[in-house]
């Protein structure tokens, strides 16, 4: 991890990797900004600002790195970004500059929205599921008309009955139209929408967030960290977001998964890093890990 301006990686949009028979393509919904102090919890600003320099409102850059996973006739999308259903105040608060672009990114990668066969959600916070649906006049409809959407059942229940601490993170318009359209598959602890791609419930950020494991065979493994490790700078065990409802559970799960990822040489996807979509973990000292960016080509 660089101490001068943070980790640097490749261009985000349409970064592509092969993992066994899987083709993995990052498709971005653009950038937004969140408060740097909230993103790094108890870590002092004097440390985190070296990795993620804040703007004049103390906000840091955040990516929306969704992942297309292709094999055979299956095209699975992990998470769907922020979407297009927000007002001017929301756009200003999160420095969204007016428009997000996941559908465009998917098309630029060589696919149509109709090509997506499965959508797998790590959670239902607004920055992970916004393009589940799109505007169609005065209503919202599924963005991916031929896809089944895989949602964790406890997260749906919590999204319908949020508490005061996280109510602002949930927008039912991002998932209720999916139920109306009859395109939802619910799961509890694990789900494998296509062979080799498995969502695993991993609480900490909230009660029911999931990471996604990708098994490319012959020891070629990948992991989509979602908000367990939102950026490459969040790899160290104590670097945990203040947004996490259960930070000690986050810590336990980092201690469970990061050693496995480092020892196995797993390909890691950092959903919210605006510069490092793909990386691997190395252990510098016992229990001390850091991310090493993986340079990638760009999908045509």
Where are these regions (language model features)?
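Conserved beta-strand hairpin/beta-sheet module of binuclear metal-dependent hydrolase folds
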Residues: 13-108, 211-228
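Metallo-beta-lactamase
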Residues: 97-111, 115-127, 143-201, 206, ...
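Residue-level marker for buried hydrophobic side chains located in beta-strands
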Residues: 76-78, 120, 149, 222-224, ...
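N-terminal amphipathic/basic-hydrophobic helices that include classical n-h-c signal peptides
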Residues: 1-15
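Active-site metal-binding loops of divalent metal-dependent hydrolases
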Residues: 29-30, 80-83, 124, 154-155, ...
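Cap/insert and terminal regions of metallo-dependent hydrolase folds
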Residues: 93-104, 213-300
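Metal-dependent catalytic neighborhoods of phosphoester/phosphodiester hydrolases
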Residues: 129-139, 280-282
């Amino acid at each position: 991890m660089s101490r001068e301006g943070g980790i640097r990686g490749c261009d985000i949009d349409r970064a592509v990797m092969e993992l066994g028979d899987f083709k993995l393509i990052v498709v971005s919904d653009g950038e937004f900004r969140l408060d740097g102090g909230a993103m790094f919890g108890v870590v002092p600003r004097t440390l985190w600002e070296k990795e993620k320099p804040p703007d004049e409102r103390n906000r840091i850059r955040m990516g929306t790195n969704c992942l297309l996973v292709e094999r055979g006739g299956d095209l699975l999308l992990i998470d769907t970004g922020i979407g297009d259903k927000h007002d001017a105040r929301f756009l200003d608060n999160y420095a969204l500059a007016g428009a997000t672009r996941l559908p465009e990114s998917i098309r630029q990668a060589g696919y149509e929205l109709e090509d997506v066969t499965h959508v797998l959600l790590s959670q239902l916070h607004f920055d992970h599921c916004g393009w589940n649906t799109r505007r169609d006049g005065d209503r919202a409809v599924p963005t991916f008309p031929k896809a089944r959407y895989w949602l964790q059942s406890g997260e749906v229940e919590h999204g319908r009955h949020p508490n005061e601490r996280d109510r602002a993170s949930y927008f039912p318009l991002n998932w209720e139209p999916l139920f109306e359209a009859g395109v939802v598959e619910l799961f509890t602890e694990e789900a494998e929408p296509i062979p080799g791609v498995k969502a695993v419930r991993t609480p900490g950020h909230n009660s029911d967030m999931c990471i996604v494991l990708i098994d490319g065979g012959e020891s070629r493994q990948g992991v989509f960290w979602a908000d367990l490790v939102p950026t490459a700078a969040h790899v160290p065990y104590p670097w945990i977001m203040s947004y996490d409802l259960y930070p000690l559970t986050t810590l336990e799960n980092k201690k469970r998964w990061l050693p496995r990822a480092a020892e196995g040489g797993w390909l890691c996807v950092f959903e919210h890093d605006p510069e490092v979509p793909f990386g691997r973990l190395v252990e510098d000292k016992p229990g001390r890990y850091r991310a090493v960016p993986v340079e990638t080509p760009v999908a045509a």
